[in-house]
Curated annotation (Swiss-Prot):
Gene Ontology CC entries for this record: cytosol
Molecular function in Gene Ontology: ketol-acid reductoisomerase activity; magnesium ion binding; NADP binding
Single biological process term from Gene Ontology: isoleucine biosynthetic process
Record's protein name: Ketol-acid reductoisomerase (NADP(+)) 1
Gene from which this protein is expressed: ilvC1
Residues that coordinate or bind NADP(+): 25-28, 51, 53, 83-86, 134
EC number: 1.1.1.86
Lineage: Bacteria, Bacillati, Actinomycetota, Actinomycetes, Kitasatosporales
Length: 332
């Protein structure tokens, strides 16, 4: 079973005694910086010249400085810019400002796991990753609660890296809910697999295949959209609240019987075998290399895929149907 840590296991004074730089001010960056500040931590935000986030961070009472200056001032540096640019930011603005005893923190392990960033031997390398979007992390913190986090140490130069990670997690409210100890390898590989095989890739492909099966059989696209995409939220919400058991308790017996007898015909042994291939490509670095090559090569295929899906009948049908739904905010 996983090791869990709570408020009583973490010493907030450790992070309160450090100088923290949060690099980036997106979804997670703003939640980390504001919550650490409110926990009595000395925080500055590091942003590149011309960042649109600068005004927002300053309006919220945070000190904003260039990334290199933030890294030079701080002894705990949390990198929360997008994965594909982390190595560039590290090489340009952070690497030469690291001192022995400093700590390099990440919210996701990709760049460490695949060696795109190679920290010096004298610094701690840690991860603190809330299992929820930044706005939820911040809201829960403000309400006196927290979002569960995972924490890991890749390099313990000081001998106190995990205690520092727990202290950081406490500063953003994570230990109120619970912190699970993991490794950079486990977090990275399971996160990428979940995104690709289930949450994003698997779900999107399943929805499209179901929609196409119905429309190709002559059913109206609008009806197919409701049955294969719109109602997915109802099911996922039930699973989120109480697992498969609550979902099955809440649906009709007809739907539940169909679940048992038809689900295995859709997700077959062949599907699971393909999932294992996907996992192997994540484990051996193939996916990470291909993604970085695609990103730094100009995102040609990425943009082609994006354009194709935006023109799919599923998307054009949904865009029109959502106009009928006053409770759905198209701008959100």
């Amino acid at each position: 079973m996983a090791e869990l840590f709570y408020d009583a296991d973490a010493d907030l004074s450790i992070i309160q005694g450090r100088k923290v730089a949060v690099i980036g001010y997106g979804s997670q960056g703003h939640a980390h910086a504001l919550s650490l500040r409110d926990s009595g931590v000395d925080v500055r935000v590091g942003l590149h010249e011309g960042s649109k986030s600068k005004a927002k961070a300053e309006e919220q009472g945070l000190r904003v400085v260039p990334v290199a200056e933030a890294a030079a001032e701080a002894d705990v540096i949390m990198i929360l810019v997008p994965d594909p640019i982390q190595a560039e930011v590290y090489e340009k603005d952070i690497k030469d400002n690291l001192k022995d005893g400093d700590a390099l923190f990440f919210g996701h392990g990709l760049n460490i796991r695949y060696g795109f960033i190679k920290p010096p031997a004298g610094v701690d390398v840690c991860m603190v990753a809330p299992k929820g979007p930044g706005h939820l992390v911040r809201r829960q913190y403000e309400e006196g609660r927290g979002v569960p986090c995972i924490a890991a140490v890749e390099q313990d130069a000081t001998g106190n890296a995990f205690a520092l990670a727990l202290s950081y997690a406490k500063g953003i409210g994570g230990t109120r809910a619970g912190v699970i100890k993991t490794t950079f390898t486990e977090e990275t590989e399971t996160d990428l697999f979940g995104e690709q095989a289930v949450l994003c890739g698997g779900t999107a492909a399943l929805v499209k295949a179901g929609f196409e099966t119905l429309t190709e059989a002559g059913y109206q696209p609008e009806i197919a959209y409701f049955e294969c995409l719109h109602e997915l939220k109802l099911i996922v919400d039930l699973m989120y609240e109480g697992g498969l058991e609550k979902m099955r308790w809440s649906i009709s017996e007809t739907a539940e019987w169909g679940d048992y007898v038809t689900g295995p015909r859709i997700i077959t042994d062949a599907t699971k075998a393909e999932m294992k291939k996907v996992l192997a490509e994540i484990q051996d670095g193939t996916f990470a290399k291909n993604w970085m090559d695609e990103y730094h090569g100009g995102l040609k295929k990425y943009n082609e895929y994006k354009k194709q899906d935006s023109e799919h009948l599923l998307e054009t049908t949904g865009k029109e149907l959502r106009k009928l739904m006053s409770w759905v905010d198209e701008e959100a």
